[in-house]
């Protein structure tokens, strides 16, 4: 196996024996084949006659589900993934009967996928990253992976929107186009870069789509005090990103006496009016995803994993974990739909918290709607000099010690700077008491990783107010990355022409030196420095210049 799609990949170069995420070579091979089959299906779907629009839409749905299933820490169940792979292939083959006779097909559209698991895994090894590096070179393969990971992130966000009945034909069409491009080995670096930039455009549309889906379904987030700890009583913990799962669980637990807590990136749920209206949405438990193996042991009730990030469960709590939708781990109880009766039964049978715990509070819900409602006051504060700078510190969190940099840079920023945060990277700064500038908190939690759209909307609005461009604003972006949704967000920012992004804690292993030179030359992307102090001095010097 060779997998280097996440920031924690082994030695910063790639996992070759077993994933740092605990993904096995078997699962890695099947996931590689899911990408290969998705590319073949996408090619076929793009060649269908105009009369086959329904089939093309279904193909996009299957590709979205397949891509999301291969995102880091989503599904580790080889049986489930194999079944999904065969479904892709069977649908691909059914669609080929609708093609004109003169259509030439690439190998990904014709390959006969073995129905024997051992042989199937060997096939996966033949069409994975390592084999393409040998035949296409590291730069072309690296760009293919950059494109693939951007589309994986897109697929995750598009899937969340789709479960709320929101689709965008432009998003679907690009996913088919982008995946089909992976079958064309004649594309050189410049041609692939062009597709990657189109992926950035489609990524931005996907972020906008999910924002519309969430706010139309649950209302615009509003600033909300969230208790960051538990209270006495029976309890259910919900992790992941799926707000519809949260809504349905809250509805089904009404009047049961059970308290529902958010975990990880579900924290922003508290800011949505249609979720916060439930009084038994009692607070938040724990920190970022990578702490779950310690935190879940001490949670006295069932745990629902709605999306990533799932880690290998410890035996002490594995029997209390329920997976939903595309999430999977062998042996865990999977819920095929939003009937949470088993979870509720488990909560009622569990001890629950025996006493209230003293805990701090955190204000969530500073989405773009709330911030832009105060735009005049913000612009006035900038003009008066009360606010000198904005700095976005957020993204994905992870376990590396170097990530304390993100805490340091927020804590040591000048007192007249506003800190924007989002994603699970927020847990690097939520413990900080940064105070206020006038009536505005210096720390504004804008939501989940997909709520990068809110940060972009605010930046674009400020640029318009000052009759300038985003790169001329008093704004710095310091992004932490971990998995493929962060790649989607990064490509969206590059599509908008945003420059000078600091990325860390390390640069992606799939970015080759030649690719990095292109990103630096065109977008001034830079790795985070040796220390927060050094980078702050560099930012201040650039402001003064």
From Swiss-Prot:
Binding of hybrid [4Fe-2O-2S] cluster, residues:
241, 265, 309, 396, 424, 449, 483, 485
Catalysed reaction equations from the record = A + NH4(+) + H2O = hydroxylamine + AH2 + H(+)
Q: List required co-factors.
A: [4Fe-4S] cluster; hybrid [4Fe-2O-2S] cluster
Q: Which residues bind [4Fe-4S] cluster?
A: 3, 6, 15, 21
Q: Name one GO cellular component term.
A: cytoplasm
Q: Which compartments does it reside in?
A: Cytoplasm
> What exactly does this protein do?
Catalyzes the reduction of hydroxylamine to form NH(3) and H(2)O.
Q: What is this protein called?
A: Hydroxylamine reductase
